[in-house]
Amino acid sequence: MLIGCFACQENQQDPQDTTQQQEQTQEPTDEVDRSQPQTGPFENTTNLTFEKQTVTEKEMIISEEHEYDAGNPDPVFAIGEGKAKGGLVTLNADTVANFNIGVKFNDTVTAKYEFKLTSSEPEPEANYDSAYIGLRLSGTGTAPNHESSRVWFLMKDQKIGLRTGKWPGCTMVPCPVDFSQGVRLIIEDDPVANVISIFYLDGDVKTPLAKLVILEDKLEFYMEGSQTPDITEPLEEPVEKTGYARIWTHHMRKVLKINDIKVSGETTASTTDPVDMLNSRDVFADTWVATDDVGRTTPVGNDTAAPGDKKVGIFYFMWHNASEQGQYNLYDHTAAYLSGGVDAVWDLIPQGNLGFAHYWAEPYFGYYNSDDEWVIRKHGYMLAEAGIDFIYVDATNGIIYERNLETLLRVWSEMRTEGYAVPQICFHCGNTESLAAASLTFLWNNYYSTGKYQDMWFMWEGKPLIFFPDSLKRTLPDEMKTFFTSRQSWAFTSDSWYTTKDGKGRWAWADMYPQSPGLSPSGEVEQMIVMCGFWANGSGGTNGGRSYTHKNGIPDYEGDWDFGYALMNTTSGLGLAFQEHFDYAKEVDPPLIMITGWNEWWAGRWGGGSGNLAQGQTICNEYRVDEKNPKYQWYYVDSFNTEYSRDIEPMTGGFNDNYFYQMVQNIRQYKGSRVQEAASEQWAIDIEGDLGQWYIVGPEYRDYQGDTVDRDHFSYVGNFRYTNTSGRNDFVTCKVSSDAENLYFYAECAKDITAPEGTNWMNLFIDADCNAQTGWYGYDYLINRSQADGKVSVEKFIGNDTWELETVGEAAYNLRGNVLQIKIARSVMNLGDTFDFKWADNSVSDGDVMQFLDLGDAAPNDRFNYRYTTEQTEIKLPDALTDDMIVLKAGSYNAFAGGKQVRLDASSTKAVLMGRGEDFYLPLAFVEEVIGVSCQGLETFNHYGITYVMPAQAIAAAGKVVTISEDGLVVISSSAIEDADILTTLYRSLM
């Protein structure tokens, strides 16, 4: 999408007129500031007065004619089960009703809420049948009986208190005011002190009533005058500093009255303004190489097509949803089978509550909760490096896991702010109108209509993509109808949801081979589904699992079938069904592929008694559901075990991460990939000398910065506390140089590198022959397991697939701040002009290759390697590139110019495109010599010894047009580029 364009703009000053501004040069810096000058983070103060229905900001004006109901929510105030007249809001009795304040204030200035509350509930009704005032809520639809609740006060008659414990728990204490007579309240939420103070007006006197002190691990509620807390509530997780506000009632016998409502504070733009991707950093993940446990190697460069504009999405689940540690029991079919055989599986089948989670196996990251930020970050990195463009979040059951969704959006938005293009998001609201309406209503009220996280939405045809039935679309207001690109989506294209429209406007999320394509409303092929597995309850009559193919059926096996566990160690991990699906999708070659799926992991146990919905269905090709047979009355729909499941996220044990690398392989073949950049400007490095020697050396091998954060979170099931503090030295950039005698390795970390400690401190792994079948998982040498007298060890792996090493030599090293350099004589290792390498810190130490995924840091991530080569391979230029284009990318030291790829400055990889918003910065010499625009009179500054300018206005004055994409691409050409697909192709093609 085009987000900026400069064409023939009038300059504020003539860049040729040196009398208007003298050239300035700042002092050189060795620090990279990619963000450039920041604007203020906050908008103007917002004052909302419900009674007068006026506000200070135009977009928050409340219409006199507006009907305050949940079905037609206002951007600021909305009512559910109540009415408003003038400035008085009345919430209905004997129901659940609410008044929403749909504005979120920033976390540095006190927010103020003022209103008159009349709340009465005749005794002896339960305390929880009360009026609740919620603050710092994750969404405007959050309620005190939701797992994502933050802070809720209770008020009625002459009592005040807090929502405590599990719903419907609450604690109330006597107070000196009588809410049944109406009390004018002033609530001040100070996020800096982390205190919420409650006052009441005694006549015209503002009088303290109570305060809530918010600590990291608990809430402390004090009545005025109390020296110790009157109520204490422990916290599993810290309360956010800001959020939404809501007044909510639970089956009160009398109406609740709220009058003369005033709200004030400073709104934050941090989650509504798009992330500035001119601050981004490409890590060149499509040039990384890896081989999985069955010998499949990810293709690179000329083994794939040139990068294009195709898109790939994957089904993502957020239902791993406990609100506290130890809340749910663990049922794991594969763990049961491995410990007790098939009899243990039969014993487990009837256990647990109906509909509750039975895991098919343990995820590699454990039985995590979906709001575990450490896991969310790992998912973001993994999916981005795999080439996933978007996730489609499961909202098919009418349930939005509010805390989990907000955490995912916040963390991934933070990662985009850090410069990394993690996947965007759309929602699958299912094919049942009522359930889809429930999901859509929440999403619209809390996200889409507010502009919150707007840059996170995956766009199709220029609008956010969403899935819901056509019947729902017909009932929506015009604003919502025109906001989305919607498609109807469900399983099995042989069913009526697809066939009645001949597939037009229909995209399947599940189908059997050969899959039918998803079509546009006019009938063009748009999409195809790819599945890595199917269903436990029949798979469309085939009884097939991960090993099933249309061509060969279910593979032969030895021994007992055991629910398909007979294939666990043979074909379940080969991805036979996955490959057949992907091969067919690549043959059809649609613009977009959707993959089912990433992290479903469990299925509910169903059945029991008469009226069994699955009567007669076959479960895992093992038994037929029989409601009259106690053993066979239970059924599972989606997942059951290693054969009958459909997750690509790595598992613990079993086939580990095979499906992940198989997915990477196929995505690259479908979308294309760049060739590896050949080594350039190779020369001898004095590792005791100036680090500036490395600036000219290319290429940069990059890693994600920020992937060493600690983990501390409870599990979804099993009462585990997952902690991981192994992250230590965070790799950012690596380089290699060489001469006839030596190889030189450079590793730069985000902060100063720690002192040497243990055998896994700053290890360098080398695959000398680029062959995964030799050495330990392909690695032939391991450098720096020990250090002495300015030297590090050089060890060689003995044999294949073993963690046995022998010392073959030593190498010089230099540790300086955040940089480690190693100099190795070529005579020590048998290395040619092409080899693979990997850095790792505090990671693998005993031969478990999977530990690259979660221990310490590895560069590149997981099993991936960098490839060093001196072989010059022709860059695959995109067809969209024309001779008049200058194409630049945020954080890149390369550009397309004159129909080829060139450096911005031949002397340094530190010379990159930098910018913010529509302001971008380039080396002066590049602007004048390559773009052909004079920089005379422009302000200059020095970056790593390179003179920079901000050239946009000068370029426009020269008659050229600048197009800036939301990905962080800058194109200088004779005319603006409006086609988003062209911009995507150019972005993906440039290193």
What are these regions (language model features)?
Residues G87-C170, P756-W761:
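Secretory/extracellular carbohydrate-interaction modules
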Residues F115-L117, E123-N145, I685-V792, S843-M850:
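Surface-exposed, glycine/proline- and aromatic-rich loop segments on solvent-exposed faces
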Residues P144, M223-T242, W248-R253, E677-E688, ...:
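Acidic/polar low-complexity flexible segments
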Residues L162-V192, D204-L209, W803-L815:
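Short, aromatic/His-centered strand-loop micro-motif at the edge of beta-sheets
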Residues T272-D686, D690, G698, I753, ...:
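Glycan-processing catalytic domains of CAZymes
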Residues T869-M991:
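Primary recognition of N-terminal secretory signal peptides and signal-anchoring hydrophobic helices
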